[in-house]
Amino acid sequence: MKIGFNEGCNRFCENHSVLEDLDLCEKYGVDYIDIQSECLDREIAAGKYTIDDLAAWFADPKHHLKMLSYNALIFFNMKQTQEEKDAVMAKLDQIIEDCNKLQCKMIVVVPSMDLTVPATLD
């Protein structure tokens, strides 16, 4: 049996850290981690590390923890304008590039919840 950790379980905890999650997963024998994009993006924007730093961590043979999935491309569907669609595709392209560096083969997608128009046509 393999054990995975969903970072969504603690993403709102005070002083949350992706790197600390990685270390704790290693310490307690977790096999896979589902990294939350909002946590990752927040810490990269704050200059705590880069995607390349994180990729080096996962590539280091002393670590057994693997990345299960990138969570998530959010609110990707039901876009009304070409500009909105292009923005989603640009974000997806960036996620794919990052996932390739992180040796991650799965992307979680979350459908839109904030629709102002009906999702179906009559």
Predicted regions and their residues:
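Hydrophobic faces of well-ordered beta-strands that scaffold small-molecule active sites
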Residues: 3-7, 33-35, 66-72, 107-109
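Glycine-rich, proline-tolerant flexible connector loops at the mouths of alpha/beta enzymes
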Residues: 34-60, 111-119
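Acidic (Asp/Glu)-rich catalytic clusters
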Residues: 20-29, 46-69, 90-103
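Short, contiguous strand/loop micro-motifs
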Residues: 7-9, 40-42, 75, 79-83, ...
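Active-site acidic/histidine proton-transfer and metal-coordination neighborhood
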Residues: 16-23, 78-122
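Boundary/entry segment of secreted carbohydrate-active catalytic domains
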Residues: 1-16
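N-terminal substrate-binding region of glycoside hydrolase catalytic domains
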Residues: 24, 28-46, 71-76
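Residue-level marker of alpha-helix boundaries and capping positions
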Residues: 11-13, 45, 86
